[in-house]
């Protein structure tokens, strides 16, 4: 019986450690209104789980701050969106995460909502790879 409990605890520990906050490859839709269509690009972003807790009894004197998996370091890359009008700026700059950590959500630079539009959302019907 003790070996079963040990195996269970070990599997739980392994699941938590292996699903930590880390870089992951994602595909995002890039669009420029002047170009009237979207392109898909590959980039890296942070994904995974962070230790957090939600208290049953809320204490107004002690705010409940949830940690999220977010970027620690960013670089920016630029891509040219094809098909833009000659007078339009066809360059699009997007963030690429280079390091991740568990921290507070910075609403100035991150969509902190429960459900955002998602990285593959496109306002236009046409998507180019």
Curated annotation (Swiss-Prot):
Transmembrane region(s): none
Glycan attachment sites: 25, 42
A molecular-function term among this protein's GO annotations: follicle-stimulating hormone activity
Lipid metabolism in keyword set: no
The UniProt record lists the keyword Transport: no
Disulfide bond positions: 21-69, 35-84, 38-122, 46-100, 50-102, 105-112
Family statement: Belongs to the glycoprotein hormones subunit beta family.
PANTHER family per UniProt: FOLLITROPIN SUBUNIT BETA (PTHR11515:SF17), GLYCOPROTEIN HORMONE BETA CHAIN (PTHR11515)
Subunit relationships: Heterodimer. The active follitropin is a heterodimer composed of an alpha chain/CGA shared with other hormones and a unique beta chain/FSHB shown here.
Protein name as catalogued: Follitropin subunit beta
């Amino acid at each position: 019986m003790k070996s079963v409990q040990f195996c269970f605890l070990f599997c739980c520990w392994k699941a938590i450690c292996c699903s930590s906050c880390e870089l992951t490859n994602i595909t995002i839709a890039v669009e420029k209104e002047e170009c009237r269509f979207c392109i898909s690009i590959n980039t890296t972003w942070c994904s995974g789980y962070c230790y957090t807790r939600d208290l049953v009894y809320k204490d107004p004197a002690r705010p409940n701050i949830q940690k999220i998996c977010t970027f620690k370091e960013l670089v920016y890359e630029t891509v040219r969106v094809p098909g833009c009008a000659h007078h339009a700026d066809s360059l699009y700059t997007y963030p690429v995460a280079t390091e991740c950590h568990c921290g507070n959500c910075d609403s100035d630079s991150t969509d902190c909502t429960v459900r955002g539009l998602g990285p593959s959302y496109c306002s236009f019907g046409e998507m180019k790879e």
